């Protein structure tokens, strides 16, 4: 039995790598999980399906630039959260704390180390987030998703890859070539509009759009809109190609399932995270990176034709979640 305290949420990019790792860890040994959530955010909804203990924290991320006046109240909330975390950790007495970034990870990671517990962290993006950079200085082990991330840390890091959350695993049958368009867990109005334009122009293809719950006004018969795709792995394995944003989880999944892809990074991401993540697709010879400001519809259609005609190769490899789970088990159970 391993008792593990976990933090990582607000977005699917932090939440699902943590859940993927926990899923793999419980295949090795029974686990008892204490999960720190952010009040009102995604993880509170998702974790209702899990038999985890949870502690909800009322915290918010810091505004950029960091010296903004509005951060005073946010810092006070984080300090208050540390007191709640301290009591919860003392009561739970974990063997290890595992955090996957985002502002909720900071009070959990710092407090865990102050109380003498092991701390492992995982960074999903090529460019590390502020929380993980800070925590890396005190963590017992740091996992990163990409080789390109190593230069940002002032210590040794372990390149594990980004844990892949696999809900189901089966091939779907489509009656024509299919393009998957996804804008991350929150969706993308830009990609939703782009999907409509492409469906009108490319009647010989079928488009499947994950809208993120956003309404779309498009009546094209070859466009199927889904609010949120639960069994993403099934689609990744079955479509001919994909058009996506450049979130770390999405890029990692594209690489893991070897999906021919066009990545259009969201330009508003912190410190150009998505642009750097997207470059990993070109490094892996999987497809193209297209900036929003440079997007030309006809040129994009040409790229889709190239990628959708490629023969798909599903390469079986170890899930990074398994790699991290084995490292946790090896350390705690030794």
Curated annotation (Swiss-Prot):
Q: Name one Pfam family in it.
A: Glyco_tran_28_C
* Membrane-topology annotation of the record: Peripheral membrane protein
EC numbers, comma separated: 2.4.1.227
Just give the chief location class: membrane
Gene Ontology terms: biological process = carbohydrate metabolic process; cell division; cell wall organization; lipid glycosylation; peptidoglycan biosynthetic process; regulation of cell shape
Where can this protein be found? Cell inner membrane
Top-level taxon in the UniProt lineage: Bacteria
Q: Which Gene3D superfamilies match?
A: Glycogen Phosphorylase B
CDD domains from the UniProt entry? GT28_MurG (cd03785)
Q: Does the keyword tRNA processing apply?
A: no
Entry's Gene Ontology cellular component terms = plasma membrane
Which reaction(s) are listed as its catalytic activity? Answer: di-trans,octa-cis-undecaprenyl diphospho-N-acetyl-alpha-D-muramoyl-L-alanyl-D-glutamyl-meso-2,6-diaminopimeloyl-D-alanyl-D-alanine + UDP-N-acetyl-alpha-D-glucosamine = di-trans,octa-cis-undecaprenyl diphospho-[N-acetyl-alpha-D-glucosaminyl-(1->4)]-N-acetyl-alpha-D-muramoyl-L-alanyl-D-glutamyl-meso-2,6-diaminopimeloyl-D-alanyl-D-alanine + UDP + H(+)
Q: What does the record give as the function of this protein?
A: Cell wall formation. Catalyzes the transfer of a GlcNAc subunit on undecaprenyl-pyrophosphoryl-MurNAc-pentapeptide (lipid intermediate I) to form undecaprenyl-pyrophosphoryl-MurNAc-(pentapeptide)GlcNAc (lipid intermediate II).
State what protein this is by name.
Answer: UDP-N-acetylglucosamine--N-acetylmuramyl-(pentapeptide) pyrophosphoryl-undecaprenol N-acetylglucosamine transferase
Which species does this protein come from?
Thermosipho melanesiensis (strain DSM 12029 / CIP 104789 / BI429)
């Amino acid at each position: 039995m391993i008792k593990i305290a976990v933090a990582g949420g607000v977005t699917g990019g932090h939440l699902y790598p943590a859940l993927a790792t926990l899923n793999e860890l419980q295949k090795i040994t029974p686990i008892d999980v204490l999960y720190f959530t952010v009040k009102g955010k995604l993880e509170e909804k998702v974790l209702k399906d899990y038999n985890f203990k949870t502690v909800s924290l009322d915290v918010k991320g810091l505004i950029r630039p960091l010296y903004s006046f509005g951060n005073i109240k946010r810092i006070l909330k984080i300090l208050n959260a540390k007191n709640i975390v301290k009591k919860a950790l003392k009561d739970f007495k974990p063997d290890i704390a595992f955090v996957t970034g985002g502002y909720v990870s900071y009070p959990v990671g710092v407090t865990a180390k102050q109380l003498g517990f092991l701390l492992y962290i995982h960074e999903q993006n090529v460019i590390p987030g502020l929380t993980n950079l800070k925590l890396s200085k005190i963590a017992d082990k740091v996992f990163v998703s990409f080789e390109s991330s190593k230069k940002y840390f002032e210590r040794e890091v372990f390149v594990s890859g980004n844990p892949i959350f696999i809900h189901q695993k089966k091939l779907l049958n489509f009656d024509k070539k299919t393009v998957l368009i996804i804008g991350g867990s929150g969706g993308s109005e830009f990609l939703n509009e782009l999907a409509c334009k492409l469906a009108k122009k490319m009647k010989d293809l079928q488009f499947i759009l994950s809208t993120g719950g956003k309404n779309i006004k498009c009546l094209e018969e070859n466009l199927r809109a889904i609010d949120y795709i639960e069994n993403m792995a099934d689609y990744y394995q079955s479509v001919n190609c994909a058009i996506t944003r450049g979130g770390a989880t999405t890029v990692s999944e594209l690489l893991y399932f070897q999906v021919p892809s066009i990545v259009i990074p969201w330009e508003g991401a912190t410190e150009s995270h998505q642009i750097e993540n997207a470059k990993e697709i070109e490094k892996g010879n999987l497809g193209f990176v297209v900036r929003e400001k440079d997007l030309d519809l006809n040129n994009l259609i040409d790229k889709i034709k190239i990628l959708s005609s490629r023969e798909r190769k599903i390469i079986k490899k170890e899930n990074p979640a398994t790699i991290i789970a084995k490292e946790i088990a090896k350390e705690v159970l030794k």
